[in-house]
Amino acid sequence: MFGQQLASDVQQYLERLEKQRQLKVGADEASAGLTMGGDALRVPFLDFATATPKRHQTVVPGVGTLHDCCEHSPLFSAVARRLLFNSLVPAQLKGRDFGGDHTAKLEFLAPELVRAVARLRFKECAPADVVPQRNAYYSVLNTFQALHRSEAFRQLVHFVRDFAQLLKTSFRASSLTETTGPPKKRAKVDVATHGRTYGTLELFQKMILMHATYFLAAVLLGDHAEQVNTFLRLVFEIPLFSDAAVRHFRQRATVFLVPRRHGKTWFLVPLIALSLASFRGIKIGYTAHIRKATEPVFEEIDACLRGWFGSARVDHVKGETISFSFPDGSRSTIVFASSHNTNGIRGQDFNLLFVDEANFIRPDAVQTIMGFLNQANCKIIFVSSTNTGKASTSFLYNLRGAADELLNVVTYICDDHMPRVVTHTNATACSCYILNKPVFITMDGAVRRTADLFLADSFMQEIIGGQARETGDDRPVLTKSAGERFLLYRPSTTTNSGLMAPDLYVYVDPAFTANTRASGTGVAVVGRYRDDYIIFALEHFFLRALTGSAPADIARCVVHSLTQVLALHPGAFRGVRVAVEGNSSQDSAVAIATHVHTEMHRLLASEGADAGSGPELLFYHCEPPGSAVLYPFFLLNKQKTPAFEHFIKKFNSGGVMASQEIVSATVRLQTDPVEYLLEQLNNLTETVSPNTDVRTYSGKRNGASDDLMVAVIMAIYLAAQAGPPHTFAPITRVS
C-alpha cells in the first residue's frame, strides 16, 4: 500500500515539473526542437493564435491551435501528425515512398510552396493573450507524451523495430540486433527491386500484419489507442487511409483466402514469434486442420525464440504450449491445437487466434472457434487456401458480400473474368490486375495443363483457387445491360430514313428436317443505320409438312414481310440482297429463291411499277463443291464462328437495334417480336474445347429453337461483308 502511494506521488511530482518546464520555455526553442530528429513532441507552444471561435479550433502538436478545417486536409493532417512519431520510426522503414526522413526535409512539397511559406511573417502575441490556446496545446501534448512514456507503447515500438530488422533479412536473422553484414535471403524470396537490399512483403502478408498490430495496439494501449493510429499510419505508410479503413483493422474477425504456396504459414511463424517476444502478457492461439500441420509451426516458433533470446527464456510443452519469459517475471504464451482436438483451446483467454487452413477444419471445431467472438479482446484471423472443389472445403466463400467486409481474397482473376479464364486453358490470370507474383511461384499455361492432365479442374480448384466449371455448363456471352438496351431502345426508321443505308439484307433459314416442331424457319430483314445494324422484320414459323408446297409457302412469307418493309419506307432502299441457306436442302433453297424472285416481280408489276423503278433484287450465289455453276443459295460452313463473334461484339457494344416499326406476320400475333428474339439470344452460349481452344456457339439450350437468332446473326454478318462482285446477283441477268 505504501509503495503504491509513493508511486502515485512521484508521478504527480513529475507532471508538475513537466508543466513548470513547459511554462518556462519560449518560442525561440521551437526551431531547436524541430531539428532534434523531427519529433514534434519536443516543440514548445508557439505564441500565436487563430481568430476563430473555440468550437472551430483544433490543436496540432508541434504546430499549435488552428482552424479545424485543417483536420479535413489529408495532406496537412498526415504531415503534421507524422512529425509526432518521426524519430520513433525504425531506420529500415525510413526513406521509403512518402515517409521517414523525407518528411523533415519537406522533399514532398513543391519548391515554390516552400519558398512562399518561408516568406510569411507572423505577428507574435503577448503570452497573456494566448493562455487558453497554450493550455489547450499542452493538454493535447501531454496526452501524446503520456503515450510515449507508457510501457505498452514502448513494446509496440520495439515490435515495429524488430519486425523491420526481420524484414531486412527476409525473416532469417539470427539476431534482432543491427548487423553490418549482407542480409540473409532465403533462396526462394523475390529479388531486391529498385536498389533495395531488404526483403519485401506480399500485400496480403502486410494486411495480416496490420490486422494483428492494430488489434494488439487497441487492446494493450486502451485509452491511447486513438493516438497510436498516427504512429501506425506512419509505420505502414498509409497516411491517407480513412478512419473507417483503420477501424476495419480492429474488427474481431477477418478471413484471408490465398492461393497455394504463397507464404501463408511461412509468414505467420515470425509474426507470432515476435509478438510473443514483444508484447508482455499476451496469449495467442494457433489451430490447424490436423496435428501434423501444427507441429512444424510449433518447432519453427520455438527455434526462432531460442535463436533470438536463448533457451533460458523459452519454456514449452511439446506440441502444445510455448511460454516466453520477460525480465519482470511476466510471460506471453501460445497454445497449439488441431481441429481434431479443439478442447485444448476451450477455456483459454486469447488475444489473437490464428486458424490455419480454415477451409479444411472440422465443423465442430468451427463451433468452438466461433465462441471466441464473444471475447472483446480476442481477434480471430482465418488463413486458408482457396479450394473450391466442394462446399465443405469452400465455406469461407459464403462471407462474400458481407457488410463488415470480413473476407480478403488473394486472386489473380477477378470475378467478372473468372468464367472466361476457366474456359481458356492457357490463361492463369486476367488483365485487370498487375500483381507482384512471387518468383518462387511457377504459374503459367504449362502448369495449368499439366495439373488438369492429372485431374480435371485441379488447377482452378487447388492452385489458383478459382471457381471450377461445372460439367456441361456453357457460358452465356451477351451481357444483361446490352439485352435491356436492345429491348427498350428502338429508333423510328420511318422518320429517319436519311440515316439508313440503301441496301436491305434478307436471310432465310428454312427448316427441312424430320422434327418439324423443334426446327422452324427463321427470316430476318436487316439494314445499316449509321454505323450500326437495325432489324426491320422478323419471321419465325413451323410448317406442318416439309414437302410439296413448303418452298412456295416459305417464299410467300418472305415476300410479304419484305414488301411491308418497302411500303413503310418508300424510296428508301435501292437494293434487296437475299440469302437462302441451303445446308438442309439445296434443291429446296433454289426453289425458295426462285419463288421469291417470281413473287416479288409479280407484286411490283401488279402495283404498276416499272422494272427499273423498284429496288434491285439480288440473290446470294455460291458454287457447291464439285460444281462449276453458281446456284442461288448460301452454304453455312466456316462462316458461323466469325459471324457469331462479330454479332456478339456489336450487340454488347449497342451496335444492334430493332426498328420501332418492326414487321412480323408470324410472331406479332403471339408476342413482341423483339422480346421473342431476345429470348433466343439469351440462350446463346459459348463452349471452348479444353484441348484445342476452339470456340463453338449454340442457341439450342433447354430444347429451345434458334432459327430466328441464326437468321438475324447471318443477315448482319452478310451486311458487314464486302464479298466478290458475283456473290449477290439477279437470278435472271439483265442484258
Curated annotation (Swiss-Prot):
Motif (Walker A motif): 258-265
Record motif Walker B motif, residues: 352-357
Pfam families linked to this entry: DNA_pack_C, DNA_pack_N
UniProt cross-references to InterPro entries, sorted A to Z: DNA_pack_C, DNA_pack_C_sf, DNA_pack_N, HSV_TRM3, P-loop_NTPase
GO BP term (any one): chromosome organization
Catalytic residue list: E357 (for atpase activity), D509 (for nuclease activity), E581 (for nuclease activity), D707 (for nuclease activity)
Record motif Nuclear localization signal, residues: 183-189
EC number(s) on file: 3.1.-.-
Entry keyword Hydrolase: yes
Keywords assigned: DNA-binding, Host nucleus, Hydrolase, Viral genome packaging, Viral release from host cell
GO molecular function: DNA binding; hydrolase activity
First-tier enzyme category under EC: hydrolase
GO cellular component, one term: host cell nucleus
Subcellular locations according to the entry: Host nucleus
Top-rank taxon: Viruses
Quaternary structure annotation from Swiss-Prot or TrEMBL: Interacts with the terminase subunits TRM1 and TRM2. Interacts with portal protein.
Family, per entry: Belongs to the herpesviridae TRM3 protein family.
Record's function text: Component of the molecular motor that translocates viral genomic DNA in empty capsid during DNA packaging. Forms a tripartite terminase complex together with TRM1 and TRM2 in the host cytoplasm. Once the complex reaches the host nucleus, it interacts with the capsid portal vertex. This portal forms a ring in which genomic DNA is translocated into the capsid. TRM3 carries an RNase H-like nuclease activity that plays an important role for the cleavage of concatemeric viral DNA into unit length genomes.
Protein name: Tripartite terminase subunit 3
UniProt source species: Human herpesvirus 1 (strain 17) (HHV-1)
Gene name tied to this protein: TRM3
